[in-house]
Amino acid sequence: MELNNLKPAAGAKHAKRRVGRGIGSGLGKTAGRGHKGQKSRSGGFHKVGFEGGQMPLQRRLPKRGFTSLTKEFVGEVRLSDLEKLPVDEIDLLALKQAGLVGELTKSAKIIATGELKRKIVVKGLGATKGARAAIEAAGGSFAE
């Protein structure tokens, strides 16, 4: 066996349908499209979602919800995430570098989920009452 002798297995390849090439092929004249009608014509097919003139499903259903303009800009950080950070002074830049908030985030808030056992200094971040109490109980402080 050589590379120039390799061939696909018998029956693995199918010949392309050659339509409109005479009556003897079985696919001559109308090329398997039948007679007349929209689907027999070139370019003759409806657009996606078209239901023959009936009001389409997408337009029958009501609009719902809205797009929040502040979604990407306010981040949430857990106490358990702050525990894992290697730095003691925590601000928005430190959170971005650690990947805890997105690059587009403009402000962040600390929430009281998890535990904090070490002393940290929080600069320029918001915190819930529970989170503030937990940080101060661990010996930490807030610098505005």
Curated annotation (Swiss-Prot):
**One GO CC term of this entry?**
cytosolic large ribosomal subunit
Chain intervals with Gly residues compositional bias: 21-31
InterPro entries per the UniProt record, alphabetical: Ribosomal_uL15, Ribosomal_uL15/eL18, Ribosomal_uL15/eL18_sf, Ribosomal_uL15_bac-type, Ribosomal_uL15_CS
Keyword RNA-binding in record: yes
Question: Cell membrane: present as a keyword of the record?
Answer: no
Q: What does this protein do?
A: Binds to the 23S rRNA.
**This protein's name:** Large ribosomal subunit protein uL15
Taxonomic lineage from the root: Bacteria, Pseudomonadati, Pseudomonadota, Betaproteobacteria, Burkholderiales
